[in-house]
C-alpha cells in the first residue's frame, strides 16, 4: 500500500509535464489568431490525419477592443472578463471546436492570460469583444468581478507603478507589465476567479494551458492556482489525467529570474532554443551546424523533459519578446524549413510548430513599425482560412504547418518517438547528419558547396522515400529515393542550391 501511495503521489506530481497528446502524437501547432470554426475544420481535415498532437489557440476570453492602432493582435492579451467571447468566436463555437478536435485525436491548449487585465489607460465604457462594461482607471471589471482590491497597485514599489528593472524580481512580479493592470495573485479570491475560468475550459475538454507572462507571476502563486484545477474531462482523457502546463518565461540568461524557478509547476518555454538555432543556421557569430552534436542541455538549455521548444513564436517572429534578429521565420522560408526540420528530428524538448499570417512589414531604423498588425480581416472580422487547390492557405494565412517539409517532419517525429539520438556525422562545417535509433535518419547541407557522402543511417536495408522533396504515395515516391545497403549505409548527394538542402527518411517512408 505504501508503494502504491508513493507511486500515485509521484504520478500526480509529474503529470503536468505530460502533454496529454494522444499516444504516438508528439507535436503541437500554434494556430495564431485563427477562428474556432476554422480550427475545428483543420483538426478534422488535416491535423488529425497528419499526426499533429494538438493546437495552441489564441486567448479565448473577452478582451478590450483596441482602435488605435486598429485591432492589433495584442489586444487579445488585454482581458476584461473570462467570458468565452472574442474575434475567434463565441462559447458555442469554442465548445464545438474542442469536441470536434478531441474526437479526431487533436488536443486543445489554451493561451491563459491570468497575470493581468487590460491597460490602465483605457476609458470607462470602452469597447470590449462581448460588450462587458469595465472601468480600468478605477480597476473595475464587474463581469469577473474584480475591483481595486484585486490588483497589485499597493504592492509595487516603483515610482511609475511599472517594471523599471528586470534585475529586481519583486518589480517584475508585482509591478505593471507595459501598463497592464497587475492582478494580486496572492489573494485567494483572485486565484479562485482564475481557477474557475480554467476549470470551465478543462470541463469543456481542453488538455492544458500556455500560461502567458509566467515570469511576471510568483511561481508559488501559479502553483496555488494550478492546485485548484480539475482533472481532465474523462470523455477524452483517462481518469485522473492532469492538465499539461507550459509557462511562458523568457530567460536568455543575465536576469534575476530563471526558468528553473518554474519547473515545479510544469514545463517552461525554452527561448534560448530558437535564438541559438537561428544563429547557427544563419551561420552568424562563427557558429556552425557541426557544433550541434551536443544540442540541448549541452548548450546550456533546461532539461529536455522540462522544455517546450519552438523555432519562432507569435512574439519573436515580429521582434517582440526574445531572441532578436537571429530568429528564423516564414519570411526566411528556406532556412526556416532547415531549422524546423532539425528541431522535429532532434529528441530534445516537446515541440511546437508555428502557423502565422502575413502582414505588410515596414522597417524603419531596423524596427518593423507594423509589428502590431492583427490577423487578416474585413472591418475587424477575422477572415476565413481558405484552402487552395495545392493545399496551401489563402487570405494571407501562411499555414507553415501545411508546408510539405514541415508536415512530413511532424510525422517523422512521431515515427522516431522514444528512439535515441544516433549516428552523428559532421564535416566540420555545416554539413551534418544524425539518426534516431533504427527508425529515422536526416542529412543537412547548409554549406556553400555540394554534399556527397556515404553515411551510416542505422536503418534496415531497402529503398526509402525522402519526405522533404516528396511523399510516399502507395508504394511509389514523388521525391528523391534513398537506397540503404544491408549494412545500413547510404550514399547522399545534396546540392547547396537545392530548394531544400536536407533529406529525411524513416521506417514508414520505406518503399
From Swiss-Prot:
Location(s), subcellular: Secreted, Extracellular space
Binding-site residues, Ca(2+): 115, 173, 182, 216
Protein name: Pancreatic alpha-amylase
Lineage summary: Eukaryota, Metazoa, Chordata, Craniata, Vertebrata
One Pfam family of this chain: Alpha-amylase_C
Subunit structure: Binds to the sea anemone inhibitor helianthamide and magnificamide.
Residue(s) at site: Transition state stabilizer: 315
Example GO biological process: carbohydrate catabolic process
